[in-house]
Amino acid sequence: MARIIVVTSGKGGVGKTTSSAAIATGLAQKGKKTVVIDFDIGLRNLDLIMGCERRVVYDFVNVIQGDATLNQALIKDKRTENLYILPASQTRDKDALTREGVAKVLDDLKAMDFEFIVCDSPAGIETGALMALYFADEAIITTNPEVSSVRDSDRILGILASKSRRAENGEEPIKEHLLLTRYNPGRVSRGDMLSMEDVLEILRIKLVGVIPEDQSVLRASNQGEPVILDINADAGKAYADTVERLLGEERPFRFIEEEKKGFLKRLFGG
């Protein structure tokens, strides 16, 4: 049975698309047949981070409107076996996503034996976001350790509890996971950022990952490569840990303590 996981947040710029790409890639690396769908109609970015923007012929909206089949629109990732991308449309209005159309695409993906359907949601509560949230079995709430980001995430939790298909049908609630991104223990200790404990205290949902602030994320994005493929990057390692936890494995949280500087680093400001 496919698990539909929405990667969402209350505000933009927290690393949702980066996280969607990394998590989908990590699941596929674990042998899980995975598709990642870009729900951000008009602002297509997922294909850039996945490095497949030149291979986009048809998109999500083309499939919904009957202009292309799902097989025509799906892009098979060249680097990772078992991984497929369904890009968003750059040209159409956000109302092009209909509930019936999205439901049919998701049902067709399930019939194709996908084990994970990762939905990269736009920020906030616009049509694409509400559509992705509506159909989710699980939600990864992505937030920075900043007050405004955490507060907006709390609003998304309210929507998940009341406006999802599961809520409407009186089914088990959506399983909620917290993903903390751009975490910098040094800034936390200086009081510039909320601590992991602060965020957990406010949102009160289970922590699935802590992704450190890492220049490798920007470098990977610019190269069109999910950062999880960079096995030397701290962020890549943290995303790999996150995937393990999603699959039910226990993993200690890394990169949450301030690194102790040695004498020479302190002396020369390294």
Swiss-Prot record:
Alphabetical list of InterPro entries matching this protein: CobQ/CobB/MinD/ParA_Nub-bd_dom (IPR002586), MinD (IPR010223), MinD_FleN (IPR025501), P-loop_NTPase (IPR027417), ParA/MinD_ATPase (IPR050625)
Effect of G15S: Less effective then wild-type
Entry's Gene Ontology molecular function annotations: ATP binding; ATP hydrolysis activity; identical protein binding
Coiled-coil blocks: none
Source superkingdom: Bacteria
Keywords assigned: ATP-binding, Cell cycle, Cell division, Cell inner membrane, Cell membrane, Membrane, Nucleotide-binding, Septation
Subcellular location: Cell inner membrane
Gene Ontology biological process terms from the UniProt entry: cell division; chromosome segregation; division septum site selection; intracellular mRNA localization
Gene3D superfamilies the record matches: P-loop containing nucleotide triphosphate hydrolases (3.40.50.300)
Disruption phenotype: In a minCDE operon disruption (minC-minD-minE), cells divide not only at midpoint but also at their poles, yielding small minicells and long rods. Loss of polar localization of several polar-localized proteins including GroEL-GroES, TnaA and YqjD.
Main location: membrane
Membrane topology summary: Peripheral membrane protein
Residues involved in ATP binding: K11, G12, G13, V14, G15, K16, T17, T18
Role: ATPase required for the correct placement of the division site. Cell division inhibitors MinC and MinD act in concert to form an inhibitor capable of blocking formation of the polar Z ring septums. Rapidly oscillates between the poles of the cell to destabilize FtsZ filaments that have formed before they mature into polar Z rings.
PANTHER family for this protein: SEPTUM SITE-DETERMINING PROTEIN MIND HOMOLOG, CHLOROPLASTIC, SEPTUM SITE-DETERMINING PROTEIN MIND HOMOLOG, CHLOROPLASTIC-RELATED
Subunit comment: Interacts with MinC and FtsZ.
This protein's name: Septum site-determining protein MinD
Gene: minD
